[in-house]
From Swiss-Prot:
GO terms for cellular component: cytosol. Belongs to the UPF0434 family. Gene3D superfamilies: 2.20.25.10. InterPro entries: Trm112-like (IPR005651). It holds the Pfam family Trm112p. It comes from Maricaulis maris (strain MCS10). The lineage of its organism: Bacteria, Pseudomonadati, Pseudomonadota, Alphaproteobacteria, Maricaulales. This is UPF0434 protein Mmar10_2939.
Length: 63
């Protein structure tokens, strides 16, 4: 993977981001490069350190 793909999300950004569906806080999965919304059961991708907070771009979490 290139360095741009492995960039982490800014911790300050994580403090203010919420799930657009549930408005709940998100958990960052560093290995998968995703922001996890437990309430919505969605994983939002992080590309080049930028969270893609569109429900249509999110992956449905497995139960």
């Amino acid at each position: 993977m290139s360095d741009t793909q492995t960039r982490d999300v800014d911790p300050k950004l994580l403090e203010i981001l919420v799930c657009p569906v549930t408005r709940e806080t998100l958990r960052y999965d560093r290995e998968a490069h995703e922001l996890i919304s437990e309430g919505a059961g969605l994983a939002y991708p992080v590309r080049d350190g930028i969270p893609i907070m569109l429900p249509d771009e999110a992956r449905q979490l497995d139960d």
